[in-house]
């Protein structure tokens, strides 16, 4: 399977190539576009100016990403909703589009296949300049239909804010990192605070939201996507 998304902090995500199989749950895809994409390592890479080229998701993902609810959720992760089951690997080309926007061209294999070998990855990596130029040309051709260079505030952050807007600024930042798949140690490093402070924030987040687990935290987010 394959897909191409255009991501920006200031515009809604756009699916500009739909190479998903017919078994993909379209509701999961809509939930992904409405806001779950915020938790995708490729989204984070695109909106934070990551180096272009071909990347394995595991090299972009936070340290606890594959233990996170998003990584295995059939409700918001289109690939996991496929009848073939859990992804075995995802790789993707990151392509800068200008004006703070970038595209990711994802190539995916499910558990009925094997991961991309070193040789396969190397061969695909050689094609990166051609892929990048082709996507940039295609995007420029369709960009006018999306409003050109105009800024349209993404609803993805609005959905996240709706779910967790009652939290303090510090708690909000920690919540976003938790759901993105960062461990307490990783969060402490990113926010430059002590690990014990992260644990205290997590405790207060759960208490304020009247929940007791990370799974419940994720479910609160999901409920906003399906409203």
Residue locations for each model-derived region?
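Regulatory hinge/linker segments at domain boundaries
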Residues: 144-170
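Pre-recognition alpha-helix immediately N-terminal to the DNA-recognition helix
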Residues: 172-173, 216
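Recognition helix of helix-turn-helix DNA-binding domains
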Residues: 181-216
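Regulatory loop-to-helix N-cap segments in sensory/regulatory domains
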Residues: 109-124
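Short helix-to-turn junction characteristic of helix-turn-helix DNA-binding domains
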Residues: 178-182, 221
């Amino acid at each position: 399977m394959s897909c191409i998304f255009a991501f920006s902090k200031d515009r809604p995500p756009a699916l500009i190539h739909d190479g998903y199989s017919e078994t993909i749950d379209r509701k999961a895809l809509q939930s992904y576009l409405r806001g779950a994409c915020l938790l995708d390592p490729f989204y984070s890479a695109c909106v934070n100016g990551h180096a272009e080229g071909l990347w394995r998701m595991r090299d972009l993902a936070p340290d606890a990403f594959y233990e996170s609810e998003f990584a295995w959720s059939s409700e918001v992760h289109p690939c996991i909703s496929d009848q073939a089951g859990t992804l075995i690997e995802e790789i993707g080309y990151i392509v800068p589009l200008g004006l703070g926007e970038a595209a990711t061209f994802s190539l995916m294999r499910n558990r009925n296949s094997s991961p991309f070998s070193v040789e396969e990855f190397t061969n695909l990596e050689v094609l990166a300049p051609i892929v990048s130029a082709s996507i940039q040309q295609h995007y420029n051709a369709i960009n006018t239909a999306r409003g050109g260079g105009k800024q349209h505030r993404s609803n993805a952050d609005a959905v996240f804010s709706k779910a967790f807007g009652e939290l303090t600024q510090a708690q909000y930042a920690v919540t976003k990192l938790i759901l993105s798949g960062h461990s307490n140690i990783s969060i402490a490093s990113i926010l430059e605070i002590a690990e014990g402070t992260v644990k205290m924030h997590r405790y207060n987040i759960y208490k304020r939201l009247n929940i007791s687990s990370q799974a419940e935290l994720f479910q609160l987010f999901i409920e906003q996507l399906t409203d």
